[in-house]
Regions:
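Short amphipathic alpha-helix used as the core "switch/output" element in two-component signaling
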Residues: 39, 61-74
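C-terminal output helix
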Residues: 106-115
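Alpha4 helix (beta4-alpha4-beta5 surface) of REC/receiver domains from two-component response regulators
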Residues: 62, 84-100, 113
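Acidic, metal-coordinating helix/loop segments flanking the phosphotransfer/catalytic sites
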Residues: 30-48
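Hydrophobic/aromatic residues positioned on beta-strands within the core alpha/beta folds
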Residues: 80-81
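Two-component/phosphorelay signaling modules centered on CheY-like receiver
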Residues: 11-29
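The feature encodes the CheY-like receiver
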Residues: 56, 86, 105
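Active-site residues of response regulator receiver
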Residues: 52-54
Length: 122
């Protein structure tokens, strides 16, 4: 079973993602802040982490780097979620270790297609 974490201050975004992705092959957890995400990753590292590009408590690239440090040799697939295509933010996230980006708001087909493209997706 694959594990995914959505890190987003918006409870609506987290709940929509959880509703779309949760199933027999995927468990979805939620974190409302970067610090919450780090604590959860230290306890159990997910296979996929989706990081909001505009968290209030820490910049997304910093969170991405810290998750990769905690993960060690088995880092998760990491996506940054943005409300618009921001090449600068995408490049900073990729340099920090992100594998791609996800635009929000998203719908079921968009989210499922993005997850199918990930090597760990079920």
């Amino acid at each position: 079973m694959k594990r995914c974490m959505f890190v987003d201050e918006s409870s609506v975004i987290r709940k929509v993602a959880k509703r779309i992705l949760s199933g027999p092959d995927m468990v979805v957890t939620e974190a409302a802040s970067g610090q919450d995400a780090l604590e959860m990753c230290a306890f159990e590292m997910p296979d996929v982490v989706v990081v909001d590009g505009s968290l209030a408590d820490m910049p997304a690239p910093e969170l991405i780097r810290r998750i990769r440090t905690i993960a060690g040799k088995m880092p998760p697939q990491i996506l940054i979620s943005l409300v618009e295509v921001d090449i600068g933010a995408i490049m900073r996230a990729k340099r920090a270790g992100a594998h791609g980006y996800l635009l929000k708001p998203f719908n079921r087909p968009q989210l499922l297609e993005r997850f199918r493209a990930l090597p760990v997706a079920a």
